[in-house]
Amino acid sequence: MINEYGYRPNVGIVIGNFNGQVLWARRYKQNAWQFPQGGINSGETAEQAMFRELFEEVGLRPKDVRILTTTRYWLKYKIPHQFIRWDAKPICIGQKQKWFLLQLVCKDTRINIQCGKKPEFDSWKWVSFWYPLSQVVFFKRNVYRRMMKEFSRAIMLPE
């Protein structure tokens, strides 16, 4: 589902533990790390998409987490020209994202990145809250900065 401007509606998920760390996942067979994220299907709310993606990508159910907050606004990033799939119709030039900050309320042994039909990730780890900002692929960095600043205020972390 791509909007008239070429942006795909999407949800992003930041999962925190009780040590102030966040789940950081490596894309399948790539040296690229990111937070879980995924598209919103037609007829789905952002929250419904988030819970579906949460299970598909990391094997967690709604009872395993608590929603702490969401981004106030949708955040957008453009995909670099060389990564756009020009043969796809409609053409997707970027993502429009609603982000969710979740608190893990179960043991992290419930995290299962092999849960979906096609795994998105092949590894994961706990990292400090601000670590992802310097590690995420360059074209997502501004969205991560804006989202993480907003979330840090919500959970009263120093910037």
Curated annotation (Swiss-Prot):
InterPro entries: Nudix_hydrolase, NUDIX_hydrolase-like_dom_sf, NUDIX_hydrolase_CS, NUDIX_hydrolase_dom, RppH. Gene3D superfamilies: Nucleoside Triphosphate Pyrophosphohydrolase. GO terms for cellular component: cytoplasm. SUPFAM superfamilies: Nudix (SSF55811). GO terms for biological process: mRNA catabolic process. Keywords: Hydrolase. Its cofactor is a divalent metal cation. It is an enzyme of class 3 (hydrolase). Pfam families: NUDIX. GO terms for molecular function: mRNA 5'-diphosphatase activity. A motif (Nudix box) lies at residues 38-59. Its EC number is 3.6.1.-. It comes from the Bacteria. Residues 6-149 form the Nudix hydrolase domain. Belongs to the Nudix hydrolase family. RppH subfamily. Accelerates the degradation of transcripts by removing pyrophosphate from the 5'-end of triphosphorylated RNA, leading to a more labile monophosphorylated state that can stimulate subsequent ribonuclease cleavage. PANTHER family: M7GPPPN-MRNA HYDROLASE (PTHR23114:SF17). This is RNA pyrophosphohydrolase. It comes from Baumannia cicadellinicola subsp. Homalodisca coagulata. The lineage of its organism: Bacteria, Pseudomonadati, Pseudomonadota, Gammaproteobacteria, Candidatus Palibaumannia.
